[in-house]
Amino acid sequence: MPVVIQADKSDLRQGPVMVTVEYQIIPERKADFLDLIHQYERIRRRDGASEWGIFYDTEAGDRYVEVFLVSSWAEHQRQHERQTQADHDLEQRLVSYIAGPPQVRHLIYAQAKE
């Protein structure tokens, strides 16, 4: 599930970075999904996320969006390196509750020029 995007080295200090992961859940697995995604919060925070949340789409009740913030692009790249086997196993269980691959987006804070 991790999506590693190569950034130009000059961009590594940019931040903060908001990562969104959109899940289309299997409706009958909703309770299992929510239980597991809240366990995943601990992993995100351990690996550097300062904020974390899971939200559902009011127009499409089986669509959930995980959102977390990290301090910089470099810190987000390090998150991928910190994944343990236990994290991977939990992630595989999470994937079994969704229909199709999650959609990951990376948004870097847009600063005004001084």
For each predicted feature, which ranges?
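Short, surface-exposed ligand-recognition loops at beta-strand->loop->(often short) alpha-helix junctions
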Residues: 24-35
